[in-house]
A protein has these predicted regions:
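Alpha/beta-hydrolase active-site loop
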Residues: 94-115
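Serine-hydrolase catalytic core
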Residues: 194-274
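Primarily recognizes the serine-hydrolase "nucleophile elbow" in alpha/beta-hydrolase
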Residues: 112-113, 119-176
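Sec-dependent N-terminal signal peptides
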Residues: 4-13
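Short beta-strand element of the alpha/beta-hydrolase
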Residues: 50-60
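Catalytic active-site module of serine/aspartate enzymes centered on a nucleophile-bearing elbow/loop
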Residues: 287-308
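Short amphipathic alpha-helix adjacent to the substrate-entry channel of hydrolases
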Residues: 66-85
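A domain-start/cap signature at the N-terminus of enzymes
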Residues: 16-52
């Protein structure tokens, strides 16, 4: 599934330097934001009473600078008095238990340090950052030591099924569509294989770590989110993926995202929204790509966060 693989390695986004540490409250006079830049995150904090806190995770190689470039959310967040935390935490398709704990603890520390409200927190991300968002949110809600339970969680075209990624990579190698595809698919098979083995023989290992496994309809890593608002964004442009990656619909992130939404709704998750879009996916440089931050309607998204 070149669409899934592309999100991992060849998104083509640049990285920022990441070692800056500065606090610039003077910017608040002009922008009504206090800007805090640390090694592992950036915070944009409204100077007026904060109505909500938004925590964002980028795709596999993305850091805060990339997210700002691809997802122009800061201006409307400022207008609506929403604090935004842009995390530099990346390069994760899944989270081990200790990683969930460390990340949850770090998010709580950030919220404590900057005295952010905890009654209206939203966590989400693009691509693999969506996987991180769902997994850490489920962990936070299930652990009493944390008091930063998200009110809502969202993903943007995320590769939620690790079993599917593995099997699609095998198909990509068989197709031999391009050298890039071969390299990407080999990397996926090696990475997942070294961690979990072949899913045909070790599906239980995949179920322990994956957001969702369609083959067995496993959603065990989401069960704590039954009362949490969930949005699942994707752009199922089958023509684009077939033309550019030789991918069928059943090999797209969109397919598994829709199946997940159906599964959760059947289980009684009452606040799940599946949001397919059409021709909204464009990179900041103007390139057409359905696997993009831009598929999210930002005004509608902020209104969703602020609705009572």
């Amino acid at each position: 599934m070149n669409n899934i693989i592309t999100l991992l390695i060849l998104i083509g986004l640049t990285s920022c330097t990441g070692n800056k540490s500065q606090e610039n409250p003077n910017n608040a006079v002009k922008s009504e934001f206090t800007e805090v830049i640390k090694e592992d995150y950036e915070l944009y904090k409204p100077t007026k009473p904060i109505k909500a806190v938004l925590i964002l995770f980028g795709g596999y190689p993305e850091v805060a600078e990339d997210v700002k470039r691809e997802f122009k959310i800061l201006e409307i967040a400022k207008e609506k008095d929403v604090a935004v935390i842009l995390s530099n935490y990346n390069r994760k398709l899944w989270l081990e238990e200790d990683e969930k704990h460390q990340l949850a603890r770090r998010l709580q520390e950030i919220i404590e340090t900057h005295q952010l409200p905890t009654d209206n927190i939203y966590i989400g991300g693009f691509s693999s950052g969506g996987n991180v968002s769902l997994l850490v949110s489920n962990y936070i809600v299930g652990m009493k030591q944390f008091y930063i339970d998200p009110k809502g969680v969202f993903i943007i075209d995320s590769p939620i099924d690790l079993d599917a990624i593995y099997s699609t990579s095998e198909k990509n190698i068989e197709r031999n569509f391009s050298a890039v595809s071969m390299q990407e698919s080999a990397w996926i098979i090696e990475t997942l294989g070294n961690s979990f083995g072949n899913p045909n023989d070790h599906l239980k290992e995949y179920e322990k770590s994956s957001v969702y496994i369609h083959r067995s309809d496993n959603t065990s890593n989401l069960q704590k989110l039954k009362s949490t608002k969930i949005r699942l964004y994707t752009e199922p442009d089958t023509l684009w993926w077939k033309t550019n990656r030789m991918a069928d619909y059943e090999e797209m992130n969109a397919y598994y995202i829709k199946k997940l939404s159906e599964s959760l709704q059947e289980q009684g998750f009452e606040h799940v929204e599946y949001i397919p879009t059409n021709n909204k996916g464009y990179r900041a440089n103007g390139d057409r790509h359905p696997h993009s931050w831009s598929i999210v309607d930002k005004e509608d998204f902020i209104n969703w966060m602020l609705e009572k």
